[in-house]
Amino acid sequence: MKVLLCLVCSFYIIVSSITTMTTGTPSMPAINRQTLYLAAYSSKLFSWNVGCVKTRHLSQEGDWVTRSLIYVFTFDKKPWETKADAFKVKWEPYSPLLRVQASDYVKYNLRAKPEYFIRTYDDDFLLLSDVKESRSPCSLWVTLKYVERIPETINRTFYANCPDPVTVPFDERCYP
């Protein structure tokens, strides 16, 4: 009986390691080096004078990653006025929370929160929402790979989980 149990356990370990090797764990976009673009959000998060929002990796110190938040402010002006501010993010592997340290300016003007719930992610997208509610305002961030066309599975997840969804129209001026 013990031999059979050991064989079953060994088989399970081998199969699970093969599965992990072939599928792998996706990397968390918020802490890797890729640029992320705001692709969609809940209408409650809309700011009429903010657009072309993206975030780039700047550095890492310990568990905290510093990213820049780059956006166009006030579309009425020509040329557009680009703003940038740094913020820090921390994610512990497999945690459902993304911790954020932002400047007072970003907290007040762009309504950044200290924590976000990670609804889902993979190497090329990240769906965040407020922590408190089950159907709370969301933001969908994607890499350049998905800027023009968001895959159907991601889109369905976004529309199912986020109230009053709004997609950001593709504007090539935003993606140099």
From Swiss-Prot:
Keywords: Disulfide bond, Glycoprotein, Secreted, Signal. Expressed in salivary glands. It is found in: Secreted. Glycans are attached at residue 155. Residues 1-24 form the signal peptide. It comes from the Eukaryota. The keyword Secreted applies. Disulfide bonds join 52-174, 138-162. Each monomer contains a pocket that accomodates cholesterol. Cholesterol derivatives (such as epicholesterol, epicholestanol, epicoprostenol, or 7-dehydrocholesterol) could also fit in the pocket with minor rearrangement of the side chain. Since arthropods are unable to synthesize cholesterol de novo, it is likely that a cholesterol ligand would be bloodmeal-derived. Homodimer; non-disulfide-linked. Each monomer accommodates one molecule of cholesterol in a pocket. Salivary tick protein that modulates host immune response. This protein blocks dendritic cell (DC) differentiation from monocytes. In addition, it inhibits up-regulation of costimulatory molecules and pro-inflammatory cytokines in response to stimuli and promotes up-regulation of co-inhibitory molecules and the anti-inflammatory cytokine interleukin-10. It has a pocket to accomodate cholesterol, which may have immune-modulatory roles, either directly or through interactions with the host gut microbiota. This is Japanin-like-RS. It comes from Rhipicephalus sanguineus.
